[in-house]
Amino acid sequence: YPWFGKDIRQGIELALENYALLHRLWREEFVDWSGRFRTPLQGFQSTPRPLDGVAPFVWHGSIRSPEIAEQAAYYGDGFFHNNIFWPISHTKQMVELYRRRYEHYGHGSADQAIVGLGGQFFARANSQDAVNEFRPYFDNAPVYGHGPSLEDFSAQTPLTVGSPQQIIDRYMTMREHVGDYQRQLFLIDHAGLPRKTVLEQIEILGTEIVPVLRRELDALRPAHVPDAPTHAARVAARDAALAAADEPAYDDAYRFGTGDNWTGLTAEGGQRAQEQSLARDRRNQARLADSPA
């Protein structure tokens, strides 16, 4: 924070204000804005515009700040709980808060909220081999060492050291505490592991752990619980909404000619843009007039 002239003690306020502005910049062509932490904007257009005119799906990450869970719920965005150093009881509390508020803001039922979790593991074919190999790294790593034992830390956090099946079994239980969730991230290059070992762990994850977790968790997920949104799905939803509202289809063509070297406008291009803007205003006014008081 100090590198950018900010006070880390205002981290939450910065996160809330900055994202509120970013959310508007992605969705509005021209923005007038003022806030606490940066200079005001007047008629500002951010470029480049979002791909296909659709803002990316955003995950809000938090360890222990309920304000970030609230922020994710307010916008209907995803909530990622960075839980790798926390007991499952804390993770459950944070995710439940997000789910309740997601439903409160009208984005869907609580179990349809988009959730991600962290995790970490070390695996070998034989569980005792995994423990024996990982323990020296754990005991001497600054982030772990000289604190709880490997066994105590593993009991209190998602860290799982053992066979691939033990890791699968441990992470299958996460659903029992937080409900169906859409993303599971794993920390692999931790505790000072050498590159060769990290690559071996990635291989085990991709071939022996993830395929089983994906298959088993997908089979348990009810039909009404969605996957995490993809860009293609968000574009399709936007297009369907435009069609349902009898609005013109999205056009990503550059709307201005390039005749004027200063403004990039030609008279024809500027007039066309003005006509499009007026047409949008008329449609908005008509919808307001048709809305119940």
Provide a role label for each language-model segment.
Residues 1-293:
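Active-site-adjacent structural elements that line small-molecule/cofactor binding pockets in enzymes
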